[in-house]
From Swiss-Prot:
Function field: G protein-coupled receptor which associates with the patched protein (PTCH) to transduce hedgehog protein signaling. Binding of sonic hedgehog (SHH) to its receptor patched prevents inhibition of smoothened (SMO) by patched. When active, SMO binds to and sequesters protein kinase A catalytic subunit PRKACA at the cell membrane, preventing PRKACA-mediated phosphorylation of GLI transcription factors which releases the GLI proteins from PRKACA-mediated inhibition and allows for transcriptional activation of hedgehog pathway target genes.
Residue intervals on the Extracellular side: 33-237, 287-318, 384-406, 477-528
Record key words, sorted: Cell membrane, Cell projection, Developmental protein, Disulfide bond, G-protein coupled receptor, Glycoprotein, Membrane, Phosphoprotein, Receptor, Signal, Transducer, Transmembrane, Transmembrane helix
Effect seen on changing residue 116 to A: Reduced sterol binding
Outcome of swapping residue 420 to F: Reduced activity in response to SHH
Species this protein is from: Mus musculus (Mouse)
UniProt-annotated stretches for the region Disordered: 35-61, 674-703
Quaternary organization: Homodimer. Interacts (via C-terminus) with protein kinase A catalytic subunit PRKACA; interacts with free PRKACA subunits and the interaction leads to sequestration of PRKACA at the membrane, preventing PRKACA-mediated phosphorylation of GLI transcription factors. Interacts with ARRB2. Interacts with BBS5 and BBS7; the interactions are indicative for the association of SMO with the BBsome complex to facilitate ciliary localization of SMO. Interacts with KIF7, DLG5 and SDCBP. Interacts with GAS8/DRC4.
Region (Interaction with BBS5 and BBS7): 542-573
Tissue: During early somite stages of embryonic development, modestly up-regulated in the cells of the node (at protein level).
Region (Interaction with DLG5): 585-597
Protein name per the record: Protein smoothened
Record gene name: Smo
Length: 793
């Protein structure tokens, strides 16, 4: 150290004067050169004295300021090159280097400092400082002190030194070591050794890509925590599971579309939207396998890893993939909550006519599409989208796990709680219906309830399992991420050979990353995500789906499907009633039913229960004979009854018009009505086809029915009982007479009870046919329906 070297300043001048005198007398150029300090040491030129080394002639240096120099013992340079650049002077001193006592030791320290070559921006500014301290210019027993500006220029780019080891005391920018405004010869040296980045860092001029405290270098695009073989293994894994998920969800979507008219019913149609979300998400995962797409997605133009997206200087490929994957994932999990809620409310309404989801579907869509949109916009606003070469996509929180916890785990955890609550309540509702009301359930409905409870249980178990796996894998990442970053930083420093302050000559050990994430955990995490999509698609793995595709194939190829169809009774009767006019002309005509009339559960079997009707379906083969059944029951009449009221009618005003039809009543009712006829005028029978003949007999007049009737159709032939209008004298007992209109019968030419002079009494039927009105009255039809309600058609 300089403190151990006594310097006798006054004795130096006579000694130097004596040396100059000897030089002039002897004329030895070699010795003069040696004394001038411009050679590196003994050599052939100085030994023989026959040759001379030319010294470049330079302009005299400016006078050294008093505060810019310090007295020192000058030594001839043993190494005239500092960090690859030639020095323009021949003498130096080790006074300023506090960790070196000789030029050899100073040279060894410079070799260690040369590890900063792997930090390009730091290396560009620290080279002059190191040469000015370890190999300063020394002349006339005074050493030049480097300026404070030269020292401070290294603080920013070389922050890694301060962070890792700290600056030595003699390199701290203190005024006694680095005075202000001092020129230095080293500042004029052009250092031609450019810095480079050691793998896994790459050179970049983008400040956003710089690795922390290593300006000019960024992390390479390929994740250094995983090997190349692990990258290939993970990519094959993603390709396989992504393809399976995409195909399963695509099959589900196609099944719904093939039978959309029957499948577009809540809550089953919610599974269509859930599978659509997972299908779009799988497309985002598989996009990396297009030619050159993965590098475009996860890498920046300078070859560094993407993080902190979106940025204005890069393409939108990373952001697009993030939006596709994240938005689809969040929309899918929100739809899952809506699905469990719809199941819960639908099961509660079983056995009633109440439609709990009516009017709520718009709110379902508003919630499921807007909430993921808000989360996506929030992530893009805070610029926390990062790329990952292992997964091949861009996602939130690869760099900062706190954002991944807030934008991924928090929504999924909330979905698990809410969806699990509704799912458990739905299963409990089904179990309660089955246990407490066994008599209300048909065998088919009970079987559907058992099947649905089993499927809901399996589905709930898978959902809880996949969410638990996702949380476990993320917590594994969160708890170990700091250790992985530390291990990677040590690896970077080892590769850069930054060993500041460790004066050792031991060989540098092999650099390796000691702690790395497990590839198996990453695979399990991806399996949970892809497995959720596959589980959502299993709801259409039913026999009903096979029937749908069979009908679709027959429809596309033009072949007929000979399998008997199941048709709802209500649809069948409505079909026959709508064609009553055609069937009246041709009673043997068969009804044709389109595929849209056919009743089936849709692709999601087991979610539609009919607890009130034990046999809601009938065979399509039997349905072809529905015309005979309708005719036998009197549903097809010569009059238009298409608007017959279904509720209790309100009695109209008592006036004769086309909407009131006379009907025969029982004798008991006739007696009661006879008293009222004294207080009101007798009414004449109205016949729409011809004027009613004037009545002159004293027979009891049928009372006006209070049931509203439709206008009569034109006169048509039909069968009526002859004894309802005449006596046995005019026709045989039990014989039938063909009349034009049962409501306006044609009188017999021998005797007509409505013509003047007719004295035959009316014959009223007794028993089941007695006391009833005409054969086509509303009362007669209703009783016939009640009596034949249990008959087999």
């Amino acid at each position: 150290m300089a403190a151990g070297r006594p310097v006798r300043g006054p004795e130096l001048a006579p000694r130097r004067l004596l040396q100059l005198l000897l030089l002039v007398l002897l004329g030895g150029p070699g010795r003069g050169a040696a004394l001038s300090g411009n050679v590196t040491g003994p050599g052939p030129h100085s030994a023989s004295g026959s040759s001379r080394r030319d010294v470049p002639v330079t302009s005299p240096p400016p006078p050294l300021l008093s505060h810019c120099g310090r007295a020192a013992h000058c030594e001839p340079l043993r190494y005239n090159v500092c960090l690859g650049s030639a020095l323009p002077y021949g003498a130096t001193t080790t006074l300023l280097a506090g960790d070196s006592d000789s030029q050899e030791e100073a040279h060894g320290k410079l070799v260690l400092w040369s590890g900063l070559r792997n930090a390009p921006r730091c290396w560009a500014v620290i080279q002059p400082l190191l040469c000015a301290v370890y190999m300063p210019k020394c002349e006339n027993d005074r050493v030049e002190l480097p300026s404070r500006t030269l020292c401070q220029a290294t603080r920013g780019p070389c922050a890694i030194v301060e962070r890792e080891r700290g600056w030595p005391d003699f390199l701290r920018c203190t005024p006694d070591h680095f005075p202000e405004g001092c020129p230095n010869e080293v500042q004029n040296i052009k250092f031609n050794s450019s810095g480079q980045c050691e793998a896994p860092l790459v050179r970049t001029d983008n400040p956003k890509s710089w690795y922390e405290d290593v300006e000019g270098c960024g992390i390479q695009c390929q994740n250094p925590l995983f090997t190349e073989a692990e990258h290939q293994d993970m990519h094959s894994y993603i390709a396989a599971f992504g393809a399976v998920t995409g195909l399963c969800t695509l099959f589900t979507l196609a099944t719904f579309v093939a039978d959309w008219r029957n499948s577009n019913r809540y809550p089953a149609v919610i599974l269509f939207y859930v599978n659509a979300c997972f299908f779009v998400g799988s497309i985002g995962w598989l996009a990396q396998f297009m030619d050159g797409a993965r590098r475009e997605i996860v890498c920046r133009a300078d070859g560094t890893m993407r993080f902190g997206e979106p940025t204005s200087s890069e393409t939108l490929s990373c952001v697009i993939i993030f939006v596709i994957v994240y938005y689809a994932l969040m929309a899918g999990v929100v739809w899952f909550v809506v699905l469990t809620y719809a199941w819960h409310t639908s099961f509660k309404a079983l056995g009633t006519t109440y439609q709990p989801l009516s009017g709520k579907t718009s709110y379902f869509h508003l919630l499921t599409w807007s909430l993921p949109f808000v989360l996506t916009v929030a992530i893009l606003a805070v610029a926390q989208v990062d790329g990952d070469s292992v997964s091949g996509i861009c996602f939130v929180g690869y760099k900062n796990y706190r954002y991944r916890a807030g934008f991924v785990l928090a929504p999924i955890g909330l979905v698990l709680i809410v969806g699990g609550y509704f799912l458990i309540r739905g299963v409990m509702t089904l179990f309660s219906i089955k246990s407490n009301h066994p008599g209300l359930l048909s065998e088919k409905a009970a079987s559907k309830i058992n099947e649905t409870m089993l499927r809901l249980g399996i589905f709930g178990f898978l959902a809880f399992g996949f969410v638990l796996i996702t949380f476990s894998c993320h917590f594994y990442d969160f708890f170990n991420q700091a250790e992985w970053e530390r291990s990677f930083r040590d690896y970077v420093l080892c590769q850069a050979n930054v060993t500041i302050g460790l004066p050792t000559k031991k060989p540098i050990p092999d650099c390796e990353i000691k702690n790395r994430p497990s590839l198996l955990v990453e695979k399990i995490n991806l399996f949970a995500m892809f497995g959720t999509g596959i589980a959502m698609s299993t709801w259409v793995w039913t026999k009903a789906t096979l029937l749908i595709w069979r009908r679709t194939w027959c429809r596309l190829t033009g072949h007929s499907d000979d399998e008997p169809k199941r048709i709802k009774k209500s649809k069948m009767i409505a079909k026959a009633f709508s064609k009553r006019r055609e069937l009246l002309q041709n009673p043997g005509q068969e009804l044709s039913f389109s595929m849209h009339t056919v009743s089936h559960d849709g692709p999601v079997a087991g979610l539609a229960f009919d607890l009130n009707e034990p046999s809601a379906d009938v065979s399509s083969a039997w349905a072809q004979h529905v015309t005979k059944m309708v005719a036998r029951r009197g549903a097809i009449l010569p009059q238009d009854v298409s608007v017959t009221p279904v509720a209790t009618p309100v009695p109209p005003e008592e006036q004769a018009n086309m909407w009131l039809v006379e009907a025969e009543i029982s004798p008991e009712l006739e007696k009661r009505l006879g008293r009222k006829k004294k207080r009101r005028k007798r009414k004449k029978e109205v016949c729409p086809l011809r004027p009613a003949p004037e009545l002159h007999h004293s027979a009891p007049v049928p009372a006006t029915s209070a049931v509203p009737r439709l206008p009569q159709l034109p006169r048509q032939k039909c069968l009526v009982a002859a004894n309802a209008w005449g006596t046995g004298e005019s026709c045989r007992q039990g014989a039938w007479t063909l009349v034009s209109n049962p409501f306006c019968p044609e009188p017999s030419p021998h005797q007509d009870p409505f013509l003047p002079g007719a004295s035959a009494p009316r014959v009223w039927a007794q028993g089941r046919l007695q006391g009833l009105g005409s054969i086509h009255s509303r009362t007669n039809l209703m009783e016939a329906e009640i009596l034949d309600a249990d008959s087999d058609f």
